[in-house]
């Protein structure tokens, strides 16, 4: 909400009350409690007829400081609440002096100044990183609508940039933006978002989570240009400041607090193909796609059935349309015999025409209005109603339907929708409708995830989800939603992917080729390269098919090349996936996350790091012109082998079988021996590639097993002109390519052979000594 009117005034109809003077400080168990008055209350006369704010400082985990500013403590506080991992035994330090009261957890502390001028400062090792000054937090009474709000304004320093707040398609840097965290089905080309997360981080190495599931209004360097303002309709405001000091460390703490991204199964990293949305399809159509892919030597790993696997006007009752798919169980069995995994579309709604609608209504499984009638409308499906997942019996009914599909052979679900959840309703468990609007996405996806966890096992569970709330990163994968089939939408999709990665989500995808309309062949081919260098890759559209031969012959070449490349990259990619699971670092990440000390990376949103070591710059032009920035170091193209210096911008032109994909120096990269499948034994026949190992440096490569654990580790250390290579663990028939090295002066315990990319060394055991 807008509170101020310029620098001197406030918006008409608003009354503001601020904490201005510390009255008393108490220690209550592990909390520091500060009582603050909105005026000087040193004289007893002024202690009457005045509000008194209660500020609670606490720590749910080391390096995280919680702040709760309370006005009236007797207000209702119905759930839902975010499922946070709150620890009870966090070591904290509380100091209460004449000048200030300070609460410390880890290296992070919150300090409240006493005396004439109010200030709340957050410090890392004694150095201020942010905070709020006098009259920059407090209580808002809106006489226009008789509503009350709490707000906070945290300072932004010179050059400080803000990121996150969910999957947003606007500029990557949030400075200057107004953000309302209210899930909406708005596509990728608007300010609306499917996945609103009231968490942001800055390039100063800290994050802030506002602990309110309802709509939180952010003014990010907009209303007050040097502050992040956030407000919520409530009698209290609770937020957490999360220490880094690096962006990766912030996400490590944040996902430890809100939940780690689960590790998707290896097969999910392959190529997904769908029926598209409103196209006509039956088993013959599906077979023509799958056989066409095989005939053209196009690797395919997952086939997805979109909405019309069910009868029209009945979504979702989980019954196959018998006219289109008379033998679904047999069809699925035949498809799986071809080595495919099967995904089907679902959503959390039910059309009135469905034969089960009356049963669901009578049993109380659908969301009701306060007067007891069903909440219904005619958008999406006629007479549409919403499953009430706060009713355990409704959850069981829904889950049993999904389990029946799994028993039929379905491997995973596309959990679509879940954004347009109304507020003029009465939930079964009495949940606050304002809070449930966003949180519904969490309980919906959690329900479906648990079905897969209980049936196929957590190690095989994967979703393709569109809506999300805080904590939903535990249920991957998430995709960007409805985008147009043009370069602008391709770029805005990338911004959304980087943004959600900066919000704690480890795995992300997008509709390759665009969803709305049909892309020209050149857009499709550029998007395929980008899509197959994303964590997850799906060909999907609305009114037209997305098989590559529907565009042109070269599209088949592009899909083949990049699918095979991704399959070969799986030893590297899956180890990065395991790191996302372990620490919350997204596989696709903004450049500023990997290079936080390079200010040139702060605003980059048309390129990204794919894991720790590989920079990808998608091409957004038909002609192939692309500009990209490389940070400090010497970078080598993954397959062209050309080398570029970092700390500068580069301009290039690429054909459709190419784009800038550069590996940073001092990297040991593992490529697999299979270009047809993502799920194979990665530690057999592994081709390690060593890129520009500098004197005094060591490169380490960890090869994962199917569960993400490390099964083999290769290290290369350089001293002068000598490179010592040692391996530990289980590996067979591995080789080492010294990129852009054509000959060596000496080699111990191995043999060598020339290749276009560099000298290839084959060890006799698990150790090598190379003299350059």
Swiss-Prot record:
InterPro entries: Alpha-glycosidase_related, Gal_mutarotase_sf_dom, Glyco_hydro_31_C, Glyco_hydro_31_N_dom, Glyco_hydro_31_TIM, Glyco_hydro_b, Glycoside_hydrolase_SF
Keyword entries, A-Z: Glycosidase, Hydrolase
Entry EC no(s): 3.2.1.177
Active site location: 416, 419, 482
Keyword Flavoprotein belongs to the record: no
Reactions mediated catalytically: Hydrolysis of terminal, non-reducing alpha-D-xylose residues with release of alpha-D-xylose
Entry keyword Hydrolase: yes
MF term (GO), any: xyloglucan 1,6-alpha-xylosidase activity
pH dependency: Optimum pH is 7.0.
GO biological process: carbohydrate metabolic process
Family according to the record: Belongs to the glycosyl hydrolase 31 family.
Quaternary organization: Homohexamer.
Biological role stated in the UniProt entry: Can catalyze the transfer of alpha-xylosyl residue from alpha-xyloside to xylose, glucose, mannose, fructose, maltose, isomaltose, nigerose, kojibiose, sucrose and trehalose.
PANTHER family associated with the record: GLYCOSIDASE FAMILY 31 (PTHR43053), MYOGENESIS-REGULATING GLYCOSIDASE (PTHR43053:SF4)
Identification of the protein by name: Alpha-xylosidase
Species this chain originates from: Escherichia coli (strain K12)
């Amino acid at each position: 909400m807008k509170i101020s009117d310029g620098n001197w005034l406030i918006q008409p109809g608003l009354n503001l009350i601020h904490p201005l003077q510390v009255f008393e400080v108490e220690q209550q168990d592990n909390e520091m409690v500060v009582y603050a008055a909105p005026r000087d209350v040193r004289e007893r006369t002024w202690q009457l007829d005045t509000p008194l704010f209660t500020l609670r400082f606490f720590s749910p985990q080391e390096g995280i400081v919680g702040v709760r500013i309370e006005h009236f403590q007797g207000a209702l506080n119905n759930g839902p609440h975010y499922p946070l991992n709150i620890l009870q035994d966090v070591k904290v330090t509380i100091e209460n002096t004449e000048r200030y009261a300070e609460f410390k957890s880890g290296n992070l502390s919150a300090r409240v100044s006493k005396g004439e001028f109010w200030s709340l400062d957050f410090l890392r090792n004694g150095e201020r990183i942010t905070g709020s000054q006098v009259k920059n937090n407090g209580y808002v009474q809106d006489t226009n609508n008789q509503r009350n709000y709490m707000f906070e304004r945290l300072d932004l320093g010179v050059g400080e940039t803000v990121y996150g707040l969910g999957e947003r398609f606007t500029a990557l840097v949030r400075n200057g933006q107004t953000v309302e965290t209210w899930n909406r089905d708005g596509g990728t080309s608007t300010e609306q978002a499917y996945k609103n997360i009231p968490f942001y981080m800055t390039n100063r190495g800290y994050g802030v989570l506002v602990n309110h599931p309802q709509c939180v209004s952010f003014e990010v360097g907009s209303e007050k240009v040097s502050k992040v303002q956030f407000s919520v309709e409530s009698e209290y405001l609770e937020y957490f400041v999360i220490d880094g000091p690096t962006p990766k460390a912030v996400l490590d703490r944040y996902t430890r607090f809100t939940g780690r991204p689960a590790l998707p199964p290896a097969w999910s990293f392959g190529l997904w193909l769908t029926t598209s949305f409103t196209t006509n399809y039956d088993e013959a159509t599906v077979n023509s796609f799958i056989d066409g892919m095989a005939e053209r030597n196009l690797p395919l790993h997952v086939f997805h059935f979109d909405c019309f696997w069910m009868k029209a006007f009945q979504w979702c009752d989980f019954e196959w349309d018998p006219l289109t798919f008379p033998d679904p169980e047999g069809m699925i069995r035949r498809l799986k015999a071809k080595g495919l995994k099967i995904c089907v579309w679902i959503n959390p709604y039910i059309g009135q025409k469905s034969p089960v609608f009356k049963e669901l209504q009578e049993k109380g499984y659908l969301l009701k209005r306060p007067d007891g009638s069903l909440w219904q409308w005619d958008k999406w499906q006629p007479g549409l109603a919403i499953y009430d997942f706060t009713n355990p019996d409704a959850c069981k009914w829904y889950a049993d339907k999904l389990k029946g599909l799994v028993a039929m052979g379905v491997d995973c679900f596309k959990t679509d929708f879940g954004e347009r959840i109304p507020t003029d309703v009465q939930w079964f468990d009495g949940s606050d409708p304002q809070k449930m609007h966003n949180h519904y996405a969490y309980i919906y996806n959690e329900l479906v995830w648990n079905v897969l966890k209980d049936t196929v096992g957590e190690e095989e569970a994967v979703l393709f989800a569109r809506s999300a709330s805080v904590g939903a990163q535990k249920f991957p994968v998430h995709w960007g939603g409805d985008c147009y089939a043009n370069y602008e939408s391709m770029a805005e999709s990338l911004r959304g992917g980087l943004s959600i990665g900066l919000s704690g989500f480890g795995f992300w995808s997008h509709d390759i080729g665009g969803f709305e309309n049909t892309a020209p062949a050149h857009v499709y081919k550029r998007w395929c390269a980008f899509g197959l260098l994303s964590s997850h890759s799906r060909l999907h559209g609305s009114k037209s098919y997305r098989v590559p031969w529907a565009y042109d012959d070269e599209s088949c070449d592009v899909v083949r090349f990049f699918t095979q490349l991704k399959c070969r990259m799986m030893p590297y990619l899956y180890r990065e996936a395991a790191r996302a699971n372990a620490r919350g670092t997204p596989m696709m990440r903004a450049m500023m996350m990997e290079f936080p000390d390079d200010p040139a990376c702060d605003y980059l949103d048309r390129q990204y790091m794919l894991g720790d070591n590989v920079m990808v710059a998608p091409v957004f032009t038909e002609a192939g012109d692309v500009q990209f920035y490389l940070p400090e170091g010497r970078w080598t193209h993954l397959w062209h082998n050309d080398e570029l210096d970092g700390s500068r911008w580069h301009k290039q032109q690429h054909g459709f079988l190419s784009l800038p994909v550069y590996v940073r120096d001092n990297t040991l990269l593992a490529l697999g021996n299979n270009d047809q499948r993502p799920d194979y034994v990665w530690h057999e026949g592994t081709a390690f590639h060593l890129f520009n190992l500098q004197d005094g440096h060591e490169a380490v490569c960890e090869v994962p097993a199917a569960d993400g654990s490390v099964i083999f580790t290769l290290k290369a250390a350089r001293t002068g002109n000598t490179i010592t290579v040692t391996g530990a663990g289980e590996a067979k028939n591995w080789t080492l390519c010294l990129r852009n090295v054509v000959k060596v002066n000496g080699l111990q315990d191995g043999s060598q052979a020339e290749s276009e990319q560099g000298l290839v060394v084959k060890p006799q055991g698990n150790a090598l000594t190379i003299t350059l």
